[in-house]
Amino acid sequence: DFVMFSMHVHENRYAFQAYSQDHYPANYVRELAHELIDNGLDMYVGHGNHTMQGIEIYKGRPIFYNHGNFAVQRFGSDDSPPNSGNLTNIEANELRDSWLQQYINLVAFAARTHYEDGKLVEILIYPLDLGVDASKTPWSRSSIPQTPAPELAQRILAEVQRYSEPFGTRISIENNIGVIRIPPEETVVVGQDLKIPGRGPAAR
């Protein structure tokens, strides 16, 4: 079996969501990810903060603290509450959610993990553009992930590099794709039984 844990969390180190412009997880998030892996988890995936955060390899297992806004819906549905000024739902939402139009909320990444004989050996990181250049992005494609232009891809990957460095994660950039290679001494066989704290011998 392969055990993955996903958590929706808005906090970063200093504040709620992206308002502090911080790209690192709150301490309790990292502690939780480590404890879960200590008890048999194979992969941690966080989301909800709206901005990219780093990648950590802990005991040979990946921790994706936040991929960014992979696909975020910026426009309200027809049953949205009435708004003042006779604005359409799209107009009202664009004004109300202007923070979603900031650069940090319009870049993200997807990742693919590669295993051999049950061991993580490589992670590929694919940068995503959710409409950074509004002048070139049709309204209908806004906030929908697309392959970025080479220059933007390099910028996004360099940022993921920087956010991952404090965790000791080394990311190389090859043909506009980020690559993490796991040294043999860091690999751990996945699929071990998940030990839940508080149950049986795993209790602390």
Where are these regions (language model features)?
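Conserved beta-sheet core of the metallophosphoesterase superfamily
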Residues: 23-109
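Beta-strand-turn-beta hairpins that frame and shape the catalytic cleft
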Residues: 1-3, 59-63, 118-121
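Solvent-exposed coil/turn segments that connect beta secondary-structure elements
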Residues: 10, 68-70, 118, 128
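Conserved residues at the C-terminal ends of beta-strands
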Residues: 6, 47, 126
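A short C-terminal boundary segment appended to hydrolase-like catalytic domains
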Residues: 79-204
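Short active-site-adjacent structural elements
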Residues: 14, 54, 73-74, 122, ...
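Short acidic, glycine-rich surface-loop motifs adjacent to enzyme active sites
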Residues: 1-20
